[in-house]
């Protein structure tokens, strides 16, 4: 396990803005700066929310480079480097390290359903290829496989494995992983709705989709938790619950992009097979943003 930067607080799983079918570099760089100004404590480009499945390798590389350049060391950048091909994941991780990312986020291999040993060897190959921290992304609903606590514990013995983004929706895993790996194993919630409860059980932060739209509120919630002000955090959560619901009525990427479009920060474009949100979902997002104090 490597020495790690301060991977705690509110991390935004950044959307990737498009304009006329191409990457919108200007909008992306402005989004990075706005996120930091609003209090976001870390950035995660080219994950699922960044539409990594529909980016070319060249586009993937560019977005990581732009994020690192624009962040200028003000907050850590955890670059998405996941694939169900170990060779491809190694290549993406090597590029992220070369670009100056502080860490990589690597999803458990999806669709091809590896065994626990296959997952271990996949992450070990990435560990052996780079020298920056690796955060496991465990998301059984999308990957179909669930990395066991035992496999995670074995991986934590390696030099660069430092933590997990946990989207199991099983709050018991926080305590089980803390017991197995200890309090220094970084645990980041991957579920906006349950992030507050995750933190109360021993989490270190959240990699959030909703913080694309509500970065200050998400950051303030984490800050309240770190101060032990759970009553204050709950008040913020009460404002955000309708937005958590609305953004995920359809794929969260489309929901987050719709919210950012309402704020005038990006164009709503997504790439097929994703499509923009329907009119009823769009109205639900608008209403939730008004409830959260993000729109008048």
From Swiss-Prot:
The keyword Cytoplasm applies. Pfam families: DHDPS (PF00701). One of its GO terms (cellular component) is cytosol. Pathway: Amino-acid biosynthesis; L-lysine biosynthesis via DAP pathway; (S)-tetrahydrodipicolinate from L-aspartate: step 3/4. GO terms for biological process: diaminopimelate biosynthetic process; lysine biosynthetic process via diaminopimelate. One of its GO terms (molecular function) is 4-hydroxy-tetrahydrodipicolinate synthase activity. SMART domains: DHDPS. The record marks 48, 111 as: Part of a proton relay during catalysis. InterPro entries: Aldolase_TIM (IPR013785), DapA (IPR005263), DapA-like (IPR002220), Schiff_base-form_aldolases_AS (IPR020625), Schiff_base-form_aldolases_CS (IPR020624). Pyruvate binds at residues 49, 207. This is 4-hydroxy-tetrahydrodipicolinate synthase. The lineage of its organism: Bacteria, Pseudomonadati, Pseudomonadota, Alphaproteobacteria, Hyphomicrobiales. The gene is dapA.
